[in-house]
């Protein structure tokens, strides 16, 4: 089974929902798709606010550029056209799926 390390950029309401889905449904996703997603990290400027879900230690970072280096798939949930665009272009330049 193919495994993909997934990095989330942006940890607001939608980012927290995606993280929760990946953390709690990875086995279901793997069974249905043949691809096992592993939440490898979450980048956001604010990593201290409680988002209502339990995130394993070491997954939160403020360094999105560094996170991009260590994942296979980047889920961009920052929004906008400036910072988000910068990270998307970086990820694509590194051959990541976005």
Positions of PLM-derived features:
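Glycine-rich Rossmann-fold phosphate-binding loop(s) that bind the pyrophosphate
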Residues: 11
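Conserved acidic residues
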Residues: 40, 58, 72
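Nucleotide donor/acceptor-binding cores
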Residues: 2-4
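Hydrophobic Val/Ile/Leu positions in short beta-strands of Rossmann-like dinucleotide-binding domains
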Residues: 6-8
């Amino acid at each position: 089974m193919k495994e993909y390390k997934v990095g989330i950029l942006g940890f607001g309401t939608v980012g927290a929902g995606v993280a929760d889905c990946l953390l709690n449904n990875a086995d279901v996703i793997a069974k249905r798709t043949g691809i096992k997603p592993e939440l490898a990290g979450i980048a956001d400027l604010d990593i201290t606010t409680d988002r209502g879900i339990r995130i394993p230690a070491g997954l939160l970072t403020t360094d999105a550029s560094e996170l991009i280096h260590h994942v296979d798939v980047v889920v961009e949930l920052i929004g906008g056209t400036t910072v988000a665009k910068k990270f998307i272009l970086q990820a694509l330049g590194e051959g990541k799926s976005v």
